[in-house]
Amino acid sequence: MKVLVILGLVLLSVMVQGKVFERCELARTLKRLGMDGYRGISLANWMCLAKWESDYNTRATNYNPGDQSTDYGIFQINSHYWCNNGRTPGAVNACHISCNALLQDDITQAVACAKRVVRDPQGIRAWVAWKAHCQNRDVSQYVQGCGV
């Protein structure tokens, strides 16, 4: 019985943690999903963004008490503007998506929403972490050795 409880806890922790991509695995996935050069944004910049926003973790969330919104997933897409979590006051849901969809191991929907974000005038500058850690920097290290 004790073994079953421990096994259950291990499986639950794996389910809660979600998928944490290896760097090159994510680079290949983003390239396959059309992110390299999308709206003039290099794959290395997308990788830098994902590193600093979520550390490549699909289940990352971050609550923002100021506007009562939450950032979701590998790109930390915000519930005030881009997705619907059913809790954020005045949410826009410009991606027309449930925020929970941004937490899936399959990042296809997260990529589609990130593409929607960068179509707005701010572009990739909508992400604070990108401005702080990636903008005007050599970001080639994020794809180095990945063959992409």
Curated annotation (Swiss-Prot):
One of its GO terms (molecular function) is lysozyme activity. One of its GO terms (cellular component) is extracellular region. PROSITE patterns: GLYCOSYL_HYDROL_F22_1, GLYCOSYL_HYDROL_F22_2. Lysozymes have primarily a bacteriolytic function; those in tissues and body fluids are associated with the monocyte-macrophage system and enhance the activity of immunoagents. Belongs to the glycosyl hydrolase 22 family. Monomer. This is Lysozyme C. The gene is LYZ.
